[in-house]
Regions:
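N-terminal Rossmann NAD(P)H-binding glycine-rich loop of SDR-like oxidoreductase domains
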Residues: 1-24
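Non-catalytic, hydrophobic alpha-helical segments
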Residues: 12, 54, 165-169, 184, ...
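NAD(P)H-binding glycine-rich loop region in Rossmannoid oxidoreductase-like domains
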Residues: 22-86, 97-106
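Conserved beta-loop-beta element that borders a ligand/cofactor-binding pocket
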Residues: 87-90, 95, 113-136
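A conserved pocket-lining segment of Rossmann-fold NAD(P)-dependent short-chain dehydrogenase/reductase
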Residues: 125-126, 139-160, 164
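Glycine/proline-rich active-site loop of Rossmann-fold NAD(P)-dependent oxidoreductases
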Residues: 135-141, 145-146, 172-182, 205-207
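Glycine-rich Rossmann NAD(P)(H)-binding loop
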Residues: 151-156, 182-189, 203
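Mobile cap/lid helix-loop segments that border enzyme active or cofactor-binding sites
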Residues: 189, 196-248
Length: 248
């Protein structure tokens, strides 16, 4: 089976390509570095020739509200158009657990737009929503830092190893389209403060972390469970402790 992985040279995409190849599939990594530009459509038709499945794990280079919306809207439009013309039978997109609950944040409004376009396209699809990755701890801390202190929102988080996300995406890609959402999450739930502290420790980052009762997540007030997966989510195999031990 030929599977084209859009964003196939990045953190998740490279792992998806490796997992598919390991199981005997023809996995094609498509990205600007391989001559495929989903914003203009350049190289898409050639990459999709003979493909059964397209996996989209791209992300916007800018998280500014207008820029991220423009990225996902244009990229998704170009992909779906090319897929319809090529006869692709399954579109798989990576999204984020809680997207529908996080609409006060521009990034998640853009992801919701992406999901809606996929649903309305007529192309059979599966949307894989993942929780935040272990690897994102430092970036999340950066977004919450005030005067050298990380000010965490009073929420819970169920982070996951990027490799387990890639495994779930690859498994979904070679399965039957669900025409809906599947969720994947890590095995443990943490207070956001605790996760950030553990993640920073792995990087040798000494910033103090505190929880502020009125603390915001990307500028928005959340309910405690907004970032948690539902009861039917697939659970990744790798714990934060196991992943952390591998980094030292």
């Amino acid at each position: 089976m030929k599977v084209v992985v859009i964003g196939g040279t990045g953190l998740i995409g490279s792992k998806v390509v490796a997992a598919l190849t390991e199981h005997g599939h023809e996995a094609v990594a498509a990205s600007p570095s391989t001559g495929v530009d989903t914003l203009t459509g350049e190289g898409l038709a050639e990459a999709l020739a003979g493909a059964s499945v397209v996996v989209d794990v791209t992300n916007s280079p800018s998280f500014a509200d207008d820029a991220v919306l423009d990225f996902f809207r244009r990229s998704t439009e170009q992909q779906l158009k090319a897929e319809s013309e090529a006869g692709v039978a399954h579109h798989v997109a990576l999204s984020v657990v809680g997207t529908d609950r996080l609409q006060a944040i521009g990034y998640f409004r853009a992801k919701q737009t992406q999901e809606d376009m996929i649903r309305e396209s007529g192309v059979p699809f599966s949307i894989v929503r993942a929780t935040q990755f272990f690897e994102f701890a430092q970036g999340l801390a950066d977004s919450a830092t005030q005067d050298g202190t990380v000010v965490a929102a009073p929420i819970k988080i169920q982070p996951i190893f990027s490799g387990d996300v890639a495994t779930a995406v690859a498994r979904t890609a070679v399965g039957t389209p669900v025409n809906g959402i599947v969720e994947v999450a890590g095995p443990d739930t943490f207070a956001f403060e605790d996760f950030l502290r553990k993640g920073l420790a792995v990087q040798g980052d000494p910033r103090p972390v505190v929880t502020e009762p009125q603390g915001l997540y990307w500028g928005a007030a959340l309910q405690e469970s907004d970032l948690l997966a539902g009861p039917d989510a697939s659970i990744g195999a790798t714990s934060l402790a196991e992943w952390s031990a591998r980094q030292t």
